[in-house]
Swiss-Prot record:
Classification via Gene3D superfamilies: Cytochrome b5-like heme/steroid binding domain
Protein name: Cytochrome b5
BP GO terms, sorted: sterol biosynthetic process
Membrane-related topology note: Single-pass membrane protein
Residues binding heme, per UniProt: H39, H63
Localization annotation: Endoplasmic reticulum membrane; Microsome membrane
Database matches in Pfam families: Cyt-b5
Family recorded in the similarity comment: Belongs to the cytochrome b5 family.
Single annotated GO MF: heme binding
Organism classification: Eukaryota, Fungi, Fungi incertae sedis, Mucoromycota, Mortierellomycotina
Function: Membrane bound hemoprotein which function as an electron carrier for several membrane bound oxygenases.
Chief location bin: endoplasmic reticulum
Gene Ontology CC annotations of this record: endoplasmic reticulum membrane
Listed SUPFAM superfamilies: Cytochrome b5-like heme/steroid binding domain (SSF55856)
Protein species of origin: Mortierella alpina
């Protein structure tokens, strides 16, 4: 087997489109360009992680042995980290959970008051009639 090419984060950052999409996973670099349309999770997932170390995202989802076999065919190199390079910050995506805004106060307090008053009135009437 031919020696694998070494890729830095700067090298990976040049491959972030559908026409050229590379991912680093567990220290290996994969050319996923030809696999984009076949990816079961959809192309958006791959494009969101393109050009960076996607190890954490890859493991968070979990992948089958078959997926790992496919990866071996996409292997193009090794990922070399340089201490002077900072990992690219993950951009917010549509799959990123958003915080749920706090509920706004409503007039349900007055409804609760009316219901409580109706229950008390019902109890008083029931006691008087029995």
């Amino acid at each position: 087997m031919a020696e694998l090419k070494s890729f830095t984060l700067a090298d990976l950052s040049q491959h972030t489109t559908k026409d050229s999409l590379y991912l680093a996973i567990h220290g290996k670099v994969y050319d996923c360009t030809g696999f984009i349309d076949e990816h079961p999770g959809g192309e958006e997932v791959l494009i969101d992680e393109a050009g960076r170390d996607a190890t954490e995202s890859f493991e968070d989802v979990g992948h089958s042995d078959e997926a790992r076999d496919i990866m071996s065919k996409l292997l193009v190199g090794e990922f070399k980290t340089d201490s002077s390079e900072k990992p690219k910050a993950k951009s917010p995506s549509s799959s990123t959970p958003r915080p749920i805004p706090a509920a706004e106060p409503s007039d349900s307090g007055s409804l609760q008051y009316v219901l409580a008053l109706a229950v008390v009135a019902g109890c008083v009437i029931w006691k008087v009639l029995l």
